[in-house]
């Protein structure tokens, strides 16, 4: 028998996906408000050198301790499941570019040697962050809610788990044979995002996962290993791993210089 707590109208306040969207939006709003208030000391006020340096150090510390870890957790929990799907692949790529711009601005902020440089870096952090979070709220999260195989409620819970400092489960084996074909890839990409460099898992499938390999090539070029352990006819087992930065760099150089 279905519990009345499980009955809801899609898109209403009782819809768990809608509730997850609201929670994620509030999280983003809180982060942006905190970053903006700290940056305003540098961008809106003309402070004495000692006060400016203190404000600069406080904003840089916030970025290192809260902002960048938040962006990293968001990438793992929300971006990775959408990284291979055709409707969201380019969107994720664009958001990751914005993350890179923010990270670069944080470095510029931390090393700024003048008020003008600190002001420019602080402004870049906030404006890029605002654009990134707006796209995430308005485009990516609604797309995740509709993406087959991606459960937005669980993804939001994964984000909260990482932000609390806990680690997400990393299964050694992912058997997708009982999962509908259209729902497999987001789950696999989400599991890959949890891997540290050098770690891997074994994918078990009932067909040769060549389409998945093409999605990995598009989303993570030269960043993963793909080794067949068993190749049919009824079962395929593939070890998928995240390469270390050194190995990935060597592979990239080898690809460019055959």
Where are these regions (language model features)?
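Small-residue-biased structural context
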Residues: 1-258
